[in-house]
Amino acid sequence: RKAVEVVLRLRHEVAAEGGCLCPEIDLGGGYGIAYTGADPVAPTAAEVARALAEAVRATCAELGDEPPRVSVEPGRCVAGPSQVTLYTVTGLKRVELGEGTCRLYVSIDGGMSDNIRPALYGAAYTALLASRRPDPAAGLVRCRVVGKHCESGDVVVRDVDLPGDIAVGDVLAVPATGAYGRSMAS
């Protein structure tokens, strides 16, 4: 709402000085999505549109200006949830962390070449077993999903609980990779 008010007040000031009320504004993008279960649920594109429309109407009414045509660039909130990347498990390695705890490293057939975001700036994702139902008796194990590249930073999912019976050949799904996964891939 604050950004809408700032843009419309600037539009009003420019019109007062120059005599021309800009007929269109672009409110940009940056509308978030949830990448993991720990992320807050983001508003839908429709909810964002309603909030922006109300802010435009209210601010224009306050200023006595004709409302402009409004453009937005919702990119990530539309594209992000639209893609799930599937990886095949190629290896497993259990590492003792001390005090009776361990982490299972789950190697996959992809990595930083198809999703650089975790390595580049620490973007967080989650992973789910997609190829079969796990054995409920196997419980969950703390895992780190790592890529196929010979780089210490090739981590796709830093910490995720996966079924204890995960095996080579299983398929993992990494949701919400549609916004930048493919466009930043090499």
Enumerate the predicted regions with their spans.
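Charged (often Lys/Glu-rich) extended helix/loop segments that serve as interaction or gating elements
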Residues: 51, 57-61, 65-186
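Active-site loop/helix belt of alpha/beta enzymes
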Residues: 1-93
